[in-house]
Amino acid sequence: MKLLVLCIFAMMATLAMSRRWNFVTPREVNKAFEVALKVQIIAGFDRTLVKWLRAHGRSLSHVQKKALYFVNRRYMQTHWANYMLWVNKKIDALGRTAVVADYTRLGAEIGRRIDMDYFYNFLKGRNMIPKYLPYMEEINRMRSADIPIRYRGK
């Protein structure tokens, strides 16, 4: 029982720290900048997935492969606020007004640096690839630039 309580407190402290001590107000980003980020992040994730499928995807069905493409898009949507914190820090460090090429470069860096191979191996190894549903098809059919995101800040 003591161990359970200790684990719960540790989890609460971890969540509190991941949300920061103070509220960071979200900064709205120009649509062109947002599109540049999304396109490059998804391109990087999809490039990683194609390489991974060549090496490990022989046993996966076509539907499971499509579900992994959805995982890429959902991962980007889920972590968008964290990406924006990092992007805002990098843009502020430039010391000049940002242009689309800056956001394109940062989006490509995010897509390249995040180790999605780990997630694909985790999902495949534990047979946790999600069942492909109609809403997944809708998001997969969208262009990278049109994938909806919500930035509420952290």
UniProtKB/Swiss-Prot annotation:
Any single GO CC term annotated in Swiss-Prot or TrEMBL for this entry: acrosomal lumen
Metal-binding found in the keyword field: no
Signal sequence extent: 1-18
UniProt keyword annotations, A-Z: Fertilization, Signal
GO biological process, one term: single fertilization
CDD domains to which the protein is assigned, alphabetical: Lysin-Sp18 (cd00243)
Organs and tissues of expression: Sperm.
Organism domain of life: Eukaryota
Record has Signal as a keyword: yes
General function of this protein: Dissolves the egg vitelline layer nonenzymatically during fertilization. It creates a hole of about 3 mu-m in diameter through which the sperm pass.
Quaternary state and interactors: Homodimer.
Official protein name in the record: Egg-lysin
Taxonomic source organism: Haliotis walallensis (Flat abalone)
